[in-house]
Amino acid sequence: DRVGIAVKDGDDYKLFTGNQTGALLVKFVLTMKKDTLNKKSTLVKTIVTSELGANIGRKFGLQIEETLTGFKYIGDKINKYEQTGEQEFVIGYEESYGYLVGTHARDKDAVVSSMLICQMASWYKNQGKTLVDGLNEIYDEYGYFLDYLDSFVLKGKDGAEKIQNLMTSFRNKGTALFDGIEEVIDFSTGIRDLPKENVLKYIWKDGSWMAVRPSGTEPKIKVYYSIVDASKENAGKRLETIRNEIKSIINA
């Protein structure tokens, strides 16, 4: 149900993240469907998925909707759209390599996604380009997005208590956690029409963000980062600084 891709780049291979593949698919699918898109056309992504694909969708005039983590919530949106007729699902995806184009399923679909990735690679090849070139074109147009996920394992009763205490600490710090944060979204309070979930999202003025949540299936606390910058080098330096600070907080 998931699909990842590796693209030959010179003498090496580049492994794409789920966010990168998602952004490429969004651009390709919307380009192919541009004559059939309308004001109801909608892209759905999870709250911990990069804004890059969403920004591409916005440029094509799509509505953007977010769900909690888990593809079942994207499936729920499709059901809702079919019942109300107010929106039309075009594409949905999440950072963990799950994609769905069309309404034939209510879960991530690696079969159709793999077919589309092959078509997309052929489309770029016919232009004398690779998927790496396609991704770089997206960065040139929308800015560089550097996404990363850290998972911290905290086992046992003490670990569970520490996870709870960490979430309380992050919640209390609010915008003071880092310089430049202009908004903190606490999904445990019920945001928009989303179910309540123990997730905190910190958003910087430049559109960069960080999200913190306990794993629902393992003794882990997960930290998602999405850094936006004009250059890959600056994004990398900034990510390293933020990650080191978060590590010091969690490992204290």
Language-model regions, residue ranges each:
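Oxyanion-binding/catalytic loops of NTP- or PPi-dependent enzymes
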Residues: 1
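Catalytic or ion-translocation cores adjacent to nucleophile or general acid/base/metal-coordination motifs
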Residues: 17-29
